[in-house]
């Protein structure tokens, strides 16, 4: 195989083929995908765009940057650390070697926590956001027509032209109002409870292979107040910041023992526009938590890999911070600490939501029960593995629902 040199002419197609072979020789599991992801980052394009640029030649600067990326990946450095970012749900998060790389299965934790507050799925929220935006655009169009009409009539001295303009304005306003009605807005403020969406009456079809969408708990009743969220072991902040984006009436506290991780989470809070609703605390779980702090939701994806297993993990996973992986002899050390203190910091009616390791679901559920919480669901991930445990601090409002779930 020829070496990648800056003197040779390298097209997109040629360099992808070369890198795929090179990565295959290094034992990487997805050599072509890795090559495409790295090249896209260098060129600033999407993967699909590569197929339209196969004959494009790389500049010396692009080739130099790509070559450095390839060498790092060949040494099994995770892709996200090389590019410096990772997609989680619909947002890009900065990541560094100081934080665990966000993973797809963790998105389910966010989805279920959102349902706990809203009673709605992420799909429903996205649909409502779409129509809300359409309604706002329609309202702006109506206002623009009215403003333009007033200005025009004020300057118009010819009565016939004024009448003609009034008719044109009426026609424009009618068109704008029709658009507003289609967006769920007629007059006045939009009624969010009646926002329409495509196929509202259609039965939701669950793709094969996805986990059961049985809800983990009925919606929390916050009586119009702010929803308070605590994320223990926040890392990049992916869980908490996604929740803040999806729940505008919420605020959150991100806790991590690592100051480097908290720095990354703070950057991401600013990038996602939720820095005004996010606070950060360097603490070993509860050690520096104010005694009176109370939350509606406590979420955590703590270290859960048994210490003796870490050396057997994929080489790129071993590049992630040990602090975010090592869960002690049985992988449950962090869960014991979190559950031991959560009763004093979760409001009645509140939710505790955990991501867990393989085979840990029932053990973590038992730890929750020991603290007086009612386990409402152990949810499987996309691979059919028990991956999340949800527990509520019961009160009379939920007692009937909980009994029904336990039958």
Predicted regions and their residues:
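S-adenosylmethionine
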Residues: 236-396, 401
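Non-catalytic accessory regions of SAM-dependent methyltransferases
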Residues: 1-43, 50, 55-58
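Charged, low-complexity interaction regions
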Residues: 146-165
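Conserved AdoMet
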Residues: 39-120
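Cationic, low-complexity basic patches in intrinsically disordered or flexible, solvent-exposed regions
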Residues: 167, 404-406
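Generic L/I/V-rich hydrophobic alpha-helical segments across diverse proteins
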Residues: 149, 172-179
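Conserved SAM/SAH cofactor-binding pocket of Class I
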Residues: 108-143, 164, 178-187, 192, ...
